[in-house]
Structures are given as structure tokens and as C-alpha cells.
């Protein structure tokens, strides 16, 4: 506690992560000690509160209505394939890890996507459409549905585009 206060407080807060009252209390104590609490970040956060330099990174599992298995899946995906670049990249890469609309909405509201650029209002207005579009694409791919353009070769596509231009 004396020699490693940041590490100690991160471990202490993580130990009571299921108790919102205790978590809030220890976060307040941590701030009073002069230790900065960094906001949740989809590319930096972990299952528990973690040390980031001289500060503590807010745990992704402390975000309300997002389960531990979902967070573990997100962290595993990030470790396997690198940081997420944007909201669409996040949704595509975590679709098979039980990340649903509600979880994405809660991440947005908590500020976990703030480091990706854009703002929360923008993300809130588009996240549902992004998820629906990706789910629709996956459903079509799983059903084996392909468009005629998927099987056409490059010459056929150019032929069609030329005929379409002439028709106008």
C-alpha cells in the first residue's frame, strides 16, 4: 500500500467491482490520494481496474449492464487482432462474442469509444444501424445467398455497367 499505492488501489477496487457502492467509495479514496482514474477505453481497458502509468484505468466490467464474459471476449479479441479502429470494426470483430446492442450502447454512454474519435452523440445515432447492417450481412452470408455480382467476373461487371450507362 505504501510503496505501490496505484497497484494496491487498482487491486482493491477490482476486488469489490460487483459492489457499486464500495467501488464508488474506493474510487473517491483513490482520487483523494492524488491518483488519477482514467475513463474506460475499449482499446486500453481490461476486466479489472488496471494500472496505466501513474493512473488507474477504469474497468470495462464496471460498466453497468455488460457481463464479464462479454468483456473477456472483447479483451481476447483485442489481444489476438490488435486495437479496434472504429465502431464498425469493433462490431464486426466482436459479433461472435455475444456483444449486443445494449452492451454497445452502454460502452458509448460510458465513453469507452471516445479514444476512437467522433463523439458520443454521433455513436448513439448510428450504432443501431451499424449493428443491424452487419447482422444482416452475416445472415445473408450464412444462408449462402450471393448476388449475381458476386459470381460475375470482372468483364461481365464492366459489360453491365456499360449497358447501364447507355440505358440512361
Region annotations inferred by a language model:
Residues 1-168:
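Noncatalytic, beta-rich nucleic-acid-contacting surfaces in large DNA/RNA-processing enzymes
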